[in-house]
C-alpha cells in the first residue's frame, strides 16, 4: 500500500549533512532518518521521521530538538509528517517543551495529548527490561504536524514468556489524514 519515494539521513549535530558528526555534549553519534511515502490506495503523500536523542547530553537533546523542528519543516514543508522516536526526555523537559511550543510556528503536536480517545496502557515508556516500568513519564513519542487526525494512542507493555521485546514499550498511534 505504501510506496517509498525518497529517503535520507541527517545527523543530530552542528553539521547535520556530515556523516558520523557529533556535536554539543553528545555521548555518541545520533541521527534522524526520514522517508517520503505515497499511499497508493488514498493517493496521498506523507513523511515519516525517526530519531533517537542522546541519552547523556542535555545540551545535545536541546539542540537536537531545535534542529529536528527546522529540518522537518525544511524537508516536509506543508506535507503531512509523523515524527517518532526515543527522545530521552520527559514531557516537562526542555527538548519536549521546544518541540511542542505552540508559540513556535515550527512546533509539532504530541499525539497522546490530542488523541480523540483516552490513552491506553502505562504512562511511562521505558522499562529497562524489568517487570515494572521505571518511570511514570514517557520518553518515547509520536509527534505530528497539523495535518493528521489522531484516532487512538497506546503504550503496549505486553511481554512474551515474561520477557520484554525491548527496554522500551512500543508506542502506537492510529492516524488519519
Can you say where each PLM-predicted feature lies in the sequence?
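Structured beta-strand-rich core segments of catalytic domains in phosphoester-bond hydrolases
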Residues: 1-45, 155
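Internal, well-ordered alpha-helical segments in soluble enzyme and binding-protein domains
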Residues: 31-33, 64, 68
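Conserved hydrophobic/aromatic beta-strand scaffold that supports enzyme active sites
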Residues: 32-36, 50, 141-142, 170-172
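Active-site metal-binding loops of divalent metal-dependent hydrolases
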Residues: 51-53, 86-87, 169
Amino acid at each position: 500500500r505504501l510506496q517509498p519515494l525518497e529517503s535520507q539521513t541527517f545527523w543530530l549535530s552542528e553539521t547535520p549533512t556530515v556523516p558520523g558528526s557529533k556535536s554539543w555534549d553528545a555521548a555518541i553519534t545520533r541521527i534522524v532518518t526520514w522517508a517520503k511515502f505515497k499511499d497508493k490506495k488514498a493517493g496521498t503523500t506523507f513523511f515519516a521521521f525517526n530519531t533517537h536523542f542522546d541519552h547523556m547530553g542535555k545540551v545535545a537533546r536541546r539542540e537536537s530538538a531545535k534542529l529536528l523542528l527546522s529540518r522537518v519543516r525544511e524537508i516536509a514543508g506543508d506535507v503531512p509528517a509523523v515524527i517518532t522516536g526515543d527522545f530521552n526526555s520527559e514531557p516537562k523537559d526542555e527538548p519536549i517543551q521546544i518541540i511542542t511550543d505552540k508559540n513556535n510556528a515550527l512546533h509539532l503536536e504530541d499525539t497522546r495529548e490530542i488523541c480523540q480517545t483516552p490513552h491506553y496502557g502505562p504512562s511511562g515508556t521505558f522499562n529497562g527490561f524489568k517487570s515494572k516500568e521505571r518511570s511514570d513519564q514517557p520518553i518515547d513519542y509520536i509527534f505530528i504536524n497539523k495535518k493528521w487526525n489522531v484516532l487512538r494512542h497506546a503504550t503496549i507493555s505486553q511481554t512474551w514468556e515474561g520477557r520484554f521485546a525491548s527496554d522500551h514499550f512500543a508506542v502506537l498511534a492510529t492516524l488519519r489524514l
